[in-house]
Amino acid sequence: MAPPNDPVHSTFNVSKTHKKDNLFELSDGKLFVKNIPLLFDVPSNVSFSTFSSICQTSRAPLPLFHCAHSTSFKGGFLGFSKEEPSHHLMNSLGKFTGRDFLSIFRFKTWWSTQWVGHSGSDLQMETQWVLLDVPEIKSYVIIIPIIEGKFRSALHPGTDGHVLVCAESGSSQVKASSFRAIVYVHVSDNPYSLMKEAYTALRVYLNTFKLLEEKSVPSFVDKFGWCTWDAFYLTVEPAGVWQGVKEFAQGGVSPRFLIIDDGWQSINFDDQDPHEDAKNLVLGGTQMTARLHRLDEGEKFRKYKAGSLLGPHPPLFEPKKPKMLISKAIEIEHAEKARDKANQSGVTDLSQFDIQIEKLKKELNEMFGGDQQNSPQPMCKNGEELQFNSQGCESGSCNSEDTGMKVFTRDLRTHFKGLDDIYVWHALCGAWGGVRPGTTHLNTKIIPCKLSQGLDGTMDDLAVIKIAEGGIGLVHPDQADDFYDSMHSYLSEVGITGVKVDVIHTLEYVGEEYGGRVELAKKYYNGLSKSLAKNFNGTGLISSMQQCNDFLLLGTKQISMGRVGDDFWFQDPNGDPNGVYWLQGVHMIHCAYNSMWMGQIIQPDWDMFQSDHVCAKFHAASRAVCGGPVYVSDSLDGHDFDLLRKLVFPDGTIPKCQYFALPTRDCIFKNPLFDGKTTLKIWNLNKYGGVIGAFNCQGAGWDPKRKRIRGYSNCYKPMTGSVHVNDIEWDQLKEASEMGKAEEYAVYLNQAEKLFLTKPTTDKIPIPIAKFAPIGLTNMFNSGGAIQGLQYEEATGEGANCASAKVEVKGGGKFLAYTSVLPSKCYLNGAEVEFEWTSQDGKLILNLPWIEETSGISSLTFIF
């Protein structure tokens, strides 16, 4: 029996204390907020209910329950009713025009991004929320479509400024005609507090997800890592992974976590031998109709022999081989596209195209080693063939401890001592095409895909086309627990500490027979959460291709980290040569604006990048201040270690910010992608300071007519802008709130290497005569992130006339501080040291060593 106040099992009720009048009112066809009309021409079938009237009880923790109800007068729910029940209902919520808004919408099934406009008709399909500027009352209002019963909702554009809500179940067998709380609205005078308050209210009301503050995050959140994807694509193999980790170690930037991306699994196609892996797969896209035929590692990793890469003369791996394979596969892809284009244009004789394609495929096969790829199962020393069952476990009399993923991960950790975490990739349904029926112990059925009407307005996507072409081998939802536990328990046993779960939103395609998208998702997410808690310490999961309200509101009770951007693209897959530049700004916009809502629920992950990319410095600067992990997808022999050393300490940790990066207020309702005038600014907080990143992202964005993201060449130009200490929202983190009250700030411009003082427009507070402010390590992008401790002391008592500043710094390199007066002495780890100081600008500089014994921590004391 649970204790009376157990937060997990207790149900709390609203107290009968006096409640403030709600700030929203629906009357005379208008939705008012603080007596200001927000939505006009609201249909008579739309209802408004206060938060307190709908959310009378909750099983949320008591502090959150109280928090939600303390601001309940700021929010409420919209509902609507129809005469006829349906599985897909559309209704206007009213209209607005001439009012600035920021929104997040799905431009692909799995990815979302920002969009701004001035009327309800400017919204895009599948809008996940819209934030309205209400300057008449110096406030902001958010409208969030949510989940009610077995239905989820999204906002769509209507005519003449109307905002439409679309409620759908995802199954023609699941119908409804009315909703009381299908949309949530909330008002606040602070846009960042607004997001916190709104999602806290929804967490308490729905109780289907947890806030980030309630959960632990993966252990690598403050570390550096490497992901294999862009280095190998599907050709990933043990020797290549080993070579990659070795290159980083030799370069002095050792990864603390490794993600073995797509390509390691046991997959094949429906027309192939059900017990053999598909061969010679290279590019993403070629595997999207393939399915898992067993739940352990593929043959490439099963064949690995213990110690084979540990000896003094390990087998040589040609670093150029992956790029050669990828290059040849791209040739094949281009040839196939040329054939398809010719076919669509009416060409009847395609034989020359087919001959060319077959020639290229033969060349690719020879590059793989020809028939050598069709090798038998790995053999034991006694010649007996190893056998694996469908659950990923070995059987037979052979000693399986000598081969496979288990010994590979063991060898990696033996040789690379700092490698804490090894993750592997898998799709939510197993592989892109799910699990192949009849090949495992699971009850699996190929389900045809049916896309919702809302996705008609999204971008063409090869992944969607391929998945719809082959359907999904769906494990019955009643076996979701068994499915994930079978896979994850095996992975945990062989040294894998977590998983990157991709292709999450395919579930919405296949809900017809399983109670709809909400009910199907609940069973899968519940099974995934249980397995995560059991097998990966409750935290070892990165969610990806998940940027939709179904997942955020249903799948995050346990999951605490997720991608906030589309994939890093090093070039435009559609052939625009300028895409190598403008795609990087698009990626940054995705991450910054998605963090506004996702950051309330999961730790934002800004994805990997390549350190030798032409825009690597652009990416590196954003990762330095993003507040999440830093990892790259460098190809073999493709590293910029000088750049990486500005991001990563020698021990593989990073100077991580204390919060997650968000757009500054003056960017919220602007278009930093193609308005030709706005510079993206993002802010974050360090332990003893704040940081602002300013980026020129102009040159690309969403095209509503073409339904795709494209380049806007008229915006390829230099930008100017300004930053201010007030751009930092100090009050969003309790520990930083006092810093927002300072009269004066020392500001360091990282790229210009300039240091100066500035004053905000705040009430004056007493300050000491000697002004001192540590900046941090200037050789790091996030200089202030190196400051781990700060303490000011003033001598007291008769005759006392000195003061001191004690600073703890992690890392080695050039330490910079501002001081208005010359310190009389400086001590480094207890020993007096010399330093440089210039009176003109107050710069104090000294070089710090990296001290391995203290994990890089140095103690500085300045005496004044």
Which stretches of residues belong to each language-model region?
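N-terminal accessory beta-strand-rich subdomains and adjacent acidic, glycine-rich linkers
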Residues: 2-203
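Aromatic-lined carbohydrate-binding/catalytic grooves of carbohydrate-active enzymes
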Residues: 219-518
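Flexible loop/turn segments at secondary-structure boundaries
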Residues: 232-236, 265-269, 429-435, 506-510, ...
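Beta-rich interaction modules in large eukaryotic scaffold/regulatory proteins
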Residues: 387, 395, 399, 404, ...
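Glycan-recognition surfaces
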Residues: 437-489, 493, 526-643, 657-679, ...
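Solvent-exposed beta-strand/loop surfaces of large extracellular or lumenal domains
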Residues: 502, 742-765, 827-847
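Carbohydrate-binding surface patches
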Residues: 623-626, 631, 668-738, 766, ...
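C-terminal beta-strand-rich structural cap/linker in extracellular carbohydrate-active enzymes
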Residues: 759-789, 815, 838-864
